[in-house]
């Protein structure tokens, strides 16, 4: 869980923290937290939060933020996207990891370990991606929390899965079996260049909202797909076998750990293309 705040590590990685997390969910304190962060009472948090997380306000289109939510949903001057259609672009700012998908694969995301079946709640769909590639993009508080489409094509239905506490995946400590899977939304993207791609947005903590702007309609490369609300988040992209080749220099860098990328940056190529 490198890069997470001390409070996040406390909630996810310690027995008292996991018990506190369970209590927050049981008492609906998360709703009060959301109401506070969306109100003007949260305005004193804006300056310290921006400074602590190195948020570059010079990039934002709006300068006057009335609430913490306003700061988190800030928009910025449109980025320069890679324009070559056969180049896979990153849908967001974040820290990239890449994994081969095997039948027994599990992925560490937001303090939980997910199999593809856990992630999608659809065993038949998950099976289609065995042998393929999973890209994980972890967004930090300083990152831009809007995300875009990776290619032209057609977007299917949004499938929302509420987060739950349950006894399937341990967060850290077997002695205190408190478990958590974050709320998430997955969509099948029928892309023109990279085959059918499953994109999943995963909310953070108990206040991380996911807003997708459309479904069941054509999509355009670089067009905004949606955004996260109030807390750092993660996006995963699932590709079937042979549908992408990571850039060689990126593949080399990933051997040392996560790699920071920007929305619109070229990260992989369609097969048969240079």
PLM feature segments, named:
Residues 1-274:
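Contiguous, well-folded functional domains in the mature portion of proteins
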């Amino acid at each position: 869980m490198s890069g997470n705040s001390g409070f996040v590590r406390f909630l996810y990685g310690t027995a008292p923290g996991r018990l506190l997390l369970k209590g927050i969910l049981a008492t609906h304190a998360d709703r009060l937290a959301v109401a506070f962060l969306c109100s003007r009472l949260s305005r004193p948090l804006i300056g310290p939060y921006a400074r602590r997380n190195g948020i570059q306000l010079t990039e934002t289109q709006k300068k006057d933020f009335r609430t913490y939510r306003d700061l988190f949903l800030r928009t910025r001057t449109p980025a320069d996207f890679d324009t070559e259609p056969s180049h896979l672009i990153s849908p967001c700012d974040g820290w990239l990891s890449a994994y081969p998908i095997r039948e027994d694969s599990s992925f560490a995301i937001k303090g939980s370990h997910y199999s593809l079946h856990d992630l999608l709640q659809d065993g038949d769909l998950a099976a289609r991606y065995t042998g393929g590639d999973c890209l994980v993009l972890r967004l930090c508080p300083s990152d831009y929390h809007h995300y875009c489409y990776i290619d032209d094509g057609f977007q299917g239905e949004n499938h929302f899965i509420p987060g739950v506490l349950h006894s399937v995946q341990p967060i850290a400590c077997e002695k205190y079996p408190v478990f958590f899977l974050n709320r998430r939304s997955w969509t099948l993207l029928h892309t023109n260049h990279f085959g059918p791609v499953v994109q999943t947005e995963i909310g953070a903590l108990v206040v991380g909202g996911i807003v997708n702007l459309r479904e069941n309609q054509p999509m355009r490369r670089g067009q905004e797909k949606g955004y996260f609300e109030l807390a750092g988040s993660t996006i995963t992209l699932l590709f079937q076998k042979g549908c992408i080749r990571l850039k060689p220099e990126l593949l080399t860098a990933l051997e040392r750990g996560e790699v920071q990328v920007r929305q619109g940056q070229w990260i992989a190529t369609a097969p048969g293309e240079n």
